[in-house]
Structure formats: C-alpha cells, structure tokens
Amino acid sequence: MNLTKEQQEIYDGKQGATLAKVMQTLVRYGELFGADAMVPVTSKYNHLVTSFGLKALAPVYELMNQLIESGNVSKQKFSADPRPLDPNVPSSFLQDFVFKNFMYSKQDDYEKQLTQLGIMEKDAYTCTCYMDEVGNTPAMGEVLSWSESSAVVYANSVLGARCNRNSGIIDLMGSVVGYVPRFGLLTDEGRKATWIVKIETTKKPEAQLLGSAIGMKVMADVPYIVGLDKWLGGELDDAAKTYLKDFGAATASNGAVGLYHVENITPEAVKYGKDLIAEDAKVYVVDDAELQRVYESYPVIWKKKDAKPKLCFMGCPHMSLQQLIDWTEKVSQSLKEAGRTRVCIPTVFTAAPAVLKKFQETPYAETLKATGVITYYICPLMYMNNPLSEKMPVITSSNKLRTYTSARYYTDAEILEQITKGGADR
C-alpha cells in the first residue's frame, strides 16, 4: 500500500491514537483485497448501514464513543438506513416487548451517537438516500464510503459513482479519516463486465425477479445487460430509475452484485458501450422460462405453508414517490373491482420520511389511507428479524426481504390480488 505523506502521518499517530487506529483498520482492509493506495472520499454525504440500536452491538457503541470523545467525527454529514421500529406497524404485545427490551433497547442512545457523529438531520433514515427528496445523490465518478448493498449497487450502476461493497463501521471510518482503499469497483478494470446477460422475454420482466435471477447467476461479478432497454423506454427517466432500484437490490441480495451496466440506459454503458465488456465474458440468457424456473425455486419456509397471510410489506428497498402514487391507484381500482373499500390483509408501504412527506402533500395520501394501507419509514427487514415476527406468515414482492427473512415472495400482480381480493395462492 502506497500512502501519501499525510496518510502515513495519520497512520503513525501524528493526529492522535484514535485516528491512527481508523487509518490502520482501513489500510488492513484494503490490503486484504489488493488495494494499491488510499484515495479521497469525494462525495458530499456518506450513508451508513447501521441504523439499529441492537443490544448485542456493545462494541459498536464503545467505538462510537471513542470517536466522539476524541473529536474524530465524520468529515461528511451522512444519512443512515431505516429505523427498525414503528408503533403504526401491526405487532403484538409480545413482539413489542421483544423489540423494545431485548432487540433494539439501545435505539435512542444510538441515535444520539449518530447525531453527534454527523447525521444529516433527524429523519435522514432510509435505504434509498439517493432519492431526490432525501438529497444524498452522488455525482458520476465521485468516490463513496457506503455499505448498504442496495444503495451501493444503485450509486455505482444508475449514478455512475464509485464505491465498493463495504461493511458496516468501515463505511463510517472512510468518512472519519476521509480516505478509502482503492480496489475493486473503484478501479476501471474492476468495473469491466465479465458477464453478458441477454434479455429475451416476451414482456417486461418483473424487476425483483430478473434481479434475483441475475444475482444468483453472476454472484459478485459485473453483468452487462442487453435487451432490457426496450422495456425501460430507452432512457434513464424516473420510471427506469425506480425499476433499477428494485432490480439492483435483488441482484445485490440474491447474489453479491455491486455494479451492473444496462446497455443504452446506465451512464457508463451509454458512455463506453461494449468497451465495458471484458474478454472471454460469459453469457447468460434470460427468457420467460428461466424467470419461471427461478420463481418456482424459492422455498416456502412458513411452518404452515398454506397459512393465510397476516401482514404484507412493500418497500424493501423503500418505495419511490411514483411507486406510492401508482400503488394507490392500483389498490383503489382493484378494491373497487372486488366490491371492497379496505385491504383484506394488513399492509404496510414503506418509504423515506422525505418521500412520505411529499406524498402527504398529494391527494393520493388520503385515498391510500382510506384503503387501510399503512405508510411509514420502518425497515421491514429489522421488523422481521424479531423471532416472533419470523413465525408470522408475511408476504412481499421484495426479493431482498424474501432472501433475508421468512417472508414469502409474490409478484406485484399477485400481491395486489392478495391484499385486495385475498387470492393469488400458489
């Protein structure tokens, strides 16, 4: 690892023992992955994955205190992943007891630490920090120190920023010292595609399902996707960004994708085209049959496989404003067709606080509320990590939530059928 004079001085402790430990940790981290240098973090804001005050994370709180007490707070303001708790989300007395007394008993204390370290503002808790309403949107080429997998893959792919799939705490350390190790997706070579994925479906593929298929196939490699542009309208508009948000989250969770290129759509694919494809790239063809095969491969891990769903979560990652509006229209229309006025399964739509605030300013907010759908900014995954929640039959159209929890995956159309008409069994 070649360090600059300033970096070496930090490493040697000339700016204090605490900052030296941070630099030493990042250098060791980089050396494990063959990094040749430390490069400056250039984005305006950081984003942290650790937003939950789990009782078991005592070493994290101790480390945070060391940083705060030594004056080594973040050089950037930052957003953080969603909060784990919400009184508006349906839960039993026992679930609440476990949440507050055993799992997230340190939530208030931890949020105080995040405030001292430099969180953007009190409601900057979302996994979709890059939304315009939130304001943490990196520019093309900027170097980041993020770790939330769905945000990293979005920033790399849709925005053209540069960030590795870091871990929690490592993300904060990059902001504290102002540098990250250069390897992997921070390099030109590391951003070359080693897979060509050909989309040969007869209709627009479900974002979460296509992302799952590609993620499980290429794992941590970089795919160059051909044929998806015709289903996305040929440009990177808000609808395409929303699609790629959900698609990317599935590639990152069902596999370990940190970057993908979509021909004629994503910025680097538009700029460099097929020059992004490495020699001897493998080929993966996705057609209707392949998507159906992947869909049917998902295990159902409910204790009672034919149980009636008790809860539906939508918004992992958090929903966009347009998604909230579109789903309001779909739910209202489907309920009308079914002769109902309210959803027949408790349903939660999650989104960033800033997005929800904007949504509340539209006439759609009252329409959705009248259907019985709850909107909030909780992290569905953190809710499902409660052992008592895990036993509940929960449905979702998020392949990330399906992968990490006991929630059962359905397509968007099937979710709509379930929550408005009680159908779509399979």
Regions found by a protein language model. Name each.
Residues M1-F313, P317-R426:
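Non-transmembrane, aqueous-exposed alpha-helical and coiled segments at domain scale
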